[in-house]
């Protein structure tokens, strides 16, 4: 196994330079446990833990090693003296800068970020063409994927379970705009070849989707063997049972790397800026640019192009509602981590409240 086959390139080589002369090895995180990581390197597989210094100096849990990360690891003396075939053990001293990162707000914690996958070139957003099919969820996944700076590809799985798979694909294409859409059946193998443009040697692809979308079945198909266990299909729910319980980096026979992730029961926004939401809803962004006032809130202002488009039917109200929801969530998440934005929001509502009180006093004088 070579570094280039693991996705190593000039970007990571440059970041590793400070460690090159200190007996460190570059390695990639393939599996993350609570207290240790399994790393892949040119020397083979390494089981490693973070040094106390790294744990102490790292500001947040999200900055510690995650699946897909490149790290600087130093082998322990017993591993340096061991011969071939002996398990290697080391210590992780640093996490190299991430080129991309797919994150979400940690479940049950409004102020914590959870890293799902890093250094990903392409994100396969897997959704099933069964009861899992949800256009609004796809919009949410697209916004988060675009914020990660990886290329999103919408994968519509279980085409054999939908009476009009091509019709469903057309619906998705209307909301994805520039993102590619691939329709396939991982169970039967139909359409798998359409994923080939993104599964090139050294490329890293992450599979993300809700529980039961068929990600494990798709990985088994790509691997050409039954490696990921899959749960039996619940005919009552028409939904596969979620079976992946951890994130893992796997090498495909053709040389690509794939990161499997557990099914996402929720995907709260984190680190998603306004541009990622706007890119997901380009028709809304284009209309907003035509409003009379640059700070138009698209509520009651005169000359609002968005309200006009909603009134005449040229803007889909379900798209607008989805845009508003994601925009509010994005703004809320930004305020949670930026005290300046939080203070500005408090000041804005203070002015609104003071204005309402002033109007009430004026109106009261005339009663």
Swiss-Prot record:
Coiled coil: none annotated. It comes from Opitutus terrae (strain DSM 11246 / JCM 15787 / PB90-1). Binds 1 zinc ion per subunit. GO terms for cellular component: cytoplasm. The gene is rsgA. Its main location: cytoplasm. The keyword Kinase does not apply. Monomer. Associates with 30S ribosomal subunit, binds 16S rRNA. This is Small ribosomal subunit biogenesis GTPase RsgA. Zn(2+) binds at residues 291, 296, 298, 304. Belongs to the TRAFAC class YlqF/YawG GTPase family. RsgA subfamily. HAMAP family: GTPase_RsgA. It holds the Pfam family RsgA_GTPase. GTP binds at residues 157-160, 209-217. One of several proteins that assist in the late maturation steps of the functional core of the 30S ribosomal subunit. Helps release RbfA from mature subunits. May play a role in the assembly of ribosomal proteins into the subunit. Circularly permuted GTPase that catalyzes slow GTP hydrolysis, GTPase activity is stimulated by the 30S ribosomal subunit. GO terms for biological process: ribosomal small subunit biogenesis. Its EC number is 3.6.1.-. PANTHER family: SMALL RIBOSOMAL SUBUNIT BIOGENESIS GTPASE RSGA. Residues 112-267 form the CP-type G domain. One of its GO terms (molecular function) is GTP binding. It is found in: Cytoplasm. It comes from the Bacteria. Keywords: Cytoplasm, GTP-binding, Hydrolase, Metal-binding, Nucleotide-binding, Ribosome biogenesis, RNA-binding, rRNA-binding, Zinc. Its cofactor is Zn(2+). NCBIfam families: ribosome small subunit-dependent GTPase A.
């Amino acid at each position: 196994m070579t570094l280039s086959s693991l996705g190593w390139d000039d970007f990571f080589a440059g970041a590793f330079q400070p460690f090159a002369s200190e007996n460190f090895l570059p390695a990639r995180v393939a599996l993350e446990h609570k207290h240790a990581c399994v790393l892949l390197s040119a020397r083979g597989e390494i089981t490693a833990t973070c040094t106390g210094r790294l744990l102490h100096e790292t500001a947040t849990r999200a900055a510690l090693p995650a699946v897909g990360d490149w790290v600087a690891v130093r082998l322990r003396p017993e591993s340096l003296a061991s011969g071939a075939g002996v398990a290697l053990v080391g210590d992780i001293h640093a996490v190299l800068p991430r080129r991309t990162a797919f994150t979400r707000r940690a479940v049950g914690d409004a102020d914590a970020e959870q890293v799902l996958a890093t250094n990903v070139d392409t994100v396969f957003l897997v959704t099933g063409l069964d009861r899992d099919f949800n256009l609004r969820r796809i919009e949410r996944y697209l916004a988060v994927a675009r914020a990660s700076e990886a290329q999103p590809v919408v994968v519509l799985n279980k085409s054999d379970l939908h009476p009009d798979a091509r019709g469903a694909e057309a619906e998705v294409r209307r909301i994805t705009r520039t993102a590619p859409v691939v329709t396939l059946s991982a169970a039967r193998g139909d359409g798998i070849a359409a994923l080939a443009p993104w599964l090139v040697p050294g490329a890293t692809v992450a599979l993300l989707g809700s529980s039961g979308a068929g990600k494990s079945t798709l990985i088994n198909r790509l691997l050409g063997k039954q490696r990921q266990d899959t749960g039996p299909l619940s005919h009552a729910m028409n939904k596969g049972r979620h079976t992946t319980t951890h994130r893992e980096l796997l090498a495909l026979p053709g040389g690509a790397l794939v990161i499997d992730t557990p099914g996402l029961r929720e995907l709260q926004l984190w680190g998603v800026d306004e541009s990622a939401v706007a890119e997901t809803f380009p028709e809304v962004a284009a209309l907003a640019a035509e409003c009379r006032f640059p700070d138009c809130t698209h509520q009651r202002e005169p000359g609002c192009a968005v309200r006009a488009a909603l009134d005449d039917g040229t803007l889909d109200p379900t798209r607008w509602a989805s845009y508003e929801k994601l925009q509010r969530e994005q703004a809320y998440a930004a305020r949670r981590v930026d005290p300046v934005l939080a203070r500005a929001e408090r000041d804005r509502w203070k002015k609104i409240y003071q204005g309402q009180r002033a109007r009430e006093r004026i109106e009261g004088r005339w009663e």
